[in-house]
Amino acid sequence: MSSGGLLLLLGLLTLWEVLTPVSSKDRPDFCELPADTGPCRVGFPSFYYNPDEKKCLEFIYGGCEGNANNFITKEECESTCAA
């Protein structure tokens, strides 16, 4: 196979990985946890995965403790948890 063919194959595999959604069996367990603001009251806009709605929603994170279902961006939440 030529180097151009290998590059095309690599590009297609990369595109497939990016466009293939996370299945529920591949989803980390912490994606099932409820949003947890934690005890602090700083107030950072954050995102969490809501398994009932099957999407990432915004919530206000207090700035400490909480749980792992807490993302700075919606995109990070979706790439980690969304199906």
Curated annotation (Swiss-Prot):
Keywords: Disulfide bond, Protease inhibitor, Secreted, Serine protease inhibitor, Signal
Tissue expression as described in the entry: Expressed by the venom gland.
Cysteines paired by S-S bonds: C31-C81, C40-C64, C56-C77
UniProt signal peptide: 1-24
Protein's cellular compartments: Secreted
GO CC aspect terms: extracellular space
Recorded superkingdom: Eukaryota
Annotated ranges, domain BPTI/Kunitz inhibitor: 31-81
Record-linked Gene3D superfamilies: Pancreatic trypsin inhibitor Kunitz domain
Site (described: Reactive bond for trypsin): R41, V42
InterPro entries linked to this entry: Kunitz_BPTI (IPR002223), Kunitz_BPTI_sf (IPR036880), Prtase_inh_Kunz-CS (IPR020901), TFPI/VKTCI-like (IPR050098)
GO molecular function: serine-type endopeptidase inhibitor activity
Family: Belongs to the venom Kunitz-type family.
PANTHER family reported for this sequence: KUNITZ-TYPE PROTEASE INHIBITOR-RELATED, SERINE PEPTIDASE INHIBITOR, KUNITZ TYPE, 3
Function statement: Serine protease inhibitor.
Protein name as catalogued: Kunitz-type serine protease inhibitor microlepidin-2
Source species: Oxyuranus microlepidotus (Inland taipan)
Organism classification: Eukaryota, Metazoa, Chordata, Craniata, Vertebrata
